């Protein structure tokens, strides 16, 4: 396997927070919060940082290194918060050694993107065909099964070059969770997680790395968060959902996926929205979370962090749709409010 390595985006999120309950001098002193993790929400987190910096006052240094790296740094307590599109496992939570909270930020769609001359957005993918492409069983662009779903497409007699993530990735977790639901062979042979043993393909680091490989290499096919495909002007496919409809990944179809699973979201918010019910639901979607400890070691940093998360899950939601992330449903925001009020430092709640 040839792996293209792309330097992780490191973004200094200049965010200023007015921290209540501390002295005026302390409130004016800069508070620095360090975080690391998912590339999936980077476009939105970047936007949030610009807007929030104009309103308030603490610097947040966020390393966009992938969900796997973010979880590792969070467990090691080398950052103030982690960020992931794949939930931590029970084993990882035990390793963290504290009360771990997954705070949903938004939901997003994982899309199938490709580079075939003359083939634009709208190529249809049935679940079994998509799984078999990543298993290496559907290896040609003009495979009869792919042609059957796309009778009008001019698909060449060329090898399909699969592109996947080379780093630990929540985007991979969402995608492989979906493949495990629709393909028994994938579930038993490969499985799901932030990292898996890929049967075939090239690797790219981060969503931006996969997008770069696909954009530069003819006959490739990979998976990225929707915003990365749009930003790079890359075509993406429609995926057949459980209702039998080929559905485009849009803000509306992603929201439909979330709505379909809203009643079953567990107390800890660890859930995927893959292969959901609903005629208009896009079948490959999930939350992106910020990971925090329920008991903060530093009252000032802890207050700054939960204040920002309150803003992000309220005022910050209005910036999500323009980047094609699905805002959190209001009923879910009400639950998150209750979760944030449980965050403490030195035994005292950090929010009213």
Language-model features: locations:
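Bacterial N-terminal signal peptides that target proteins for export
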Residues: 1-12
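Glycine-centered signal
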Residues: 3, 22-24
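Bacterial N-terminal signal peptides
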Residues: 11-21
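Flexible loop/hinge segments at secondary-structure junctions
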Residues: 24-352
